[in-house]
Regions:
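Short, flexible turn/loop "capping" segments at secondary-structure junctions
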Residues: 2-3, 49
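Active-site-proximal beta-strand elements of phosphoester/diester hydrolases
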Residues: 4-14, 18, 95, 107, ...
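Active-site metal-binding loops of divalent metal-dependent hydrolases
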Residues: 12, 45, 111
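Short, flexible loop segments at the rims of nucleotide/cofactor-binding pockets, characterized by
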Residues: 17-20, 56-61, 116-122, 138
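Cys-nucleophile CN-hydrolase/nitrilase-fold catalytic domain and related Cys-dependent amidase chemistry
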Residues: 19, 27-101, 106-107
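Active-site catalytic loop in hydrolytic enzyme cores
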Residues: 87-138
C-alpha cells in the first residue's frame, strides 16, 4: 500500500435481479483495479439492482454475496464497500458492507429508507449508526 489512499468508485451497468452474473461482472472489474486501489466502492444493491422483490432477491450473510466479497478483498488485497439486499432474522435490509483484505467486516443497515421508491414498504430500517476510520487501510504494512 502507498501513503495515499487510492479509491476506485465503480459505477457500471447492473444486470437486473441476476446475482450470479453481477458477482462475476464486478469480480472482474475488481481484478482489473487490483494493485492500483486500496478501496473499491461498488454501487448500492450491486448484486440485484434496486429491486423491491426482496423475498426473491435477498441473500443471507452466509449465502453467496458476503463470502464472495471476502474472497475478493483477500485475493485482490483491497477493501471493498457497497450494499446488497440482506435477509436477517426474517427481515429484509439494504445492508452496506465494508470488508478489508485482512478480513475485518463492518455492516450497516440503511436507516433512512427512500419513501418515494416505496423502499420503506419492502425493507426494514436499520437502527444503528456506523462510523469507520479509513486511515489504517492506507498505512504501509
Amino acid at each position: 500500500m502507498t501513503e495515499d489512499l487510492r479509491i476506485s468508485m465503480i459505477q457500471s451497468h447492473i444486470i437486473w435481479e441476476d446475482r450470479e452474473e453481477n458477482l462475476g461482472y464486478y469480480g472482474e472489474l475488481l481484478r482489473r483495479v487490483s494493485g492500483r486501489t486500496d478501496l473499491a466502492v461498488l454501487p448500492e444493491t450491486f448484486t440485484t439492482g434496486f429491486s423491491m422483490d426482496v423475498e426473491k432477491q435477498a441473500d443471507t450473510m452466509e449465502g453467496q454475496t458476503v463470502p464472495t466479497i471476502k474472497e475478493w478483498a483477500k485475493k485482490y488485497k483491497l477493501a471493498v464497500a457497497g450494499s446488497f439486499i440482506a435477509k436477517d432474522n426474517g427481515k429484509f435490509y439494504n445492508r452496506a458492507f465494508f470488508i478489508t483484505p485482512e478480513g475485518e467486516e463492518y455492516y450497516y443497515d440503511k436507516r433512512h429508507l427512500f419513501r418515494m421508491a416505496e423502499e420503506d414498504k419492502h425493507f426494514s430500517a436499520g437502527d444503528k449508526r456506523l462510523i469507520l476510520s479509513l486511515i489504517h487501510i492506507s498505512q504501509p504494512t
